[in-house]
Amino acid sequence: MPNPHYRSTSYRKIHTKLPSGKSTIHYERRKNNRAVCAICKKPLQGVKTNLLYKYSKTEKRPERMYGGYICYKCLENLIKQTLRGSS
């Protein structure tokens, strides 16, 4: 039976074979997916995905409008559209 903190689904099991020939299970934290833009679905730049508890709020994502949600190109187009009055 694994330790209680390894029973969470945030850990994945890795079956490894030891040099003695015995097989054992190692536990590793799951990796998060890349953050993608909500409009064009391209990966976002400057957004951290793993071990988020180590970083402050401003280190996790850019500090502009919609930072960490849409990419800079889509934001640029959105601002242009709103300033020109079209929707």
Swiss-Prot record:
UniProt entry tagged with the keyword Ribonucleoprotein: yes
Family label: Belongs to the eukaryotic ribosomal protein eL34 family.
InterPro entries: Ribosomal_eL34, Ribosomal_eL34_C_sf, Ribosomal_eL34_CS, Ribosomal_L34e_arc-type
Coiled-coil portions: none
Example of a GO MF term: structural constituent of ribosome
Entries under Gene3D superfamilies matching the protein: 6.20.340.10
One of the protein's GO biological processes: translation
Keyword hit for Ribosomal protein: yes
Protein name listed in UniProt: Large ribosomal subunit protein eL34
GO cellular component: ribonucleoprotein complex; ribosome
Keywords linked to the UniProt accession: Ribonucleoprotein, Ribosomal protein
